[in-house]
Amino acid sequence: MLRRTASLAFLSTVLLTAACAQPALNVAGKRQKLVLQVSDAEAAKWNLALNNAKNVQDELGASNVDIEIVAYGPGINMIKFDSVANSRVSEAIKAGISVVACENTMRNLKISRSDIITGAIYVPAGVVQIMRRQSEGYAYVRP
């Protein structure tokens, strides 16, 4: 009886461990997907988001991951031409990272497309874009 109980406990542990195991990244050529939220006015947060994007790209390889940074609210200032992060954001775009601007925020803050860094993508609502990406299997990070 004790032996049978011990065997069942061991089997349960093995099955539970297998069920809880995280899937490996980049399995069989599967492309990874990441969406980053930037909604703060702090340059430190912008730099953190850009660092996260670059680190993920470096770790997985640019051809193995789709990365999107969605800027809305006060975070929209990160992707303006006069931003302190301008050169880093431009580098990210050149490296294949999608940078997305929320048109709701732009309208509310009276920001035009001519104020935004070249190469940005525009969506009607930043939060809805993040929701869409999550439903498409993107991992979500808010630095």
Segments (PLM) and residue ranges:
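N-terminal export leaders
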Residues: 1-10, 15-16
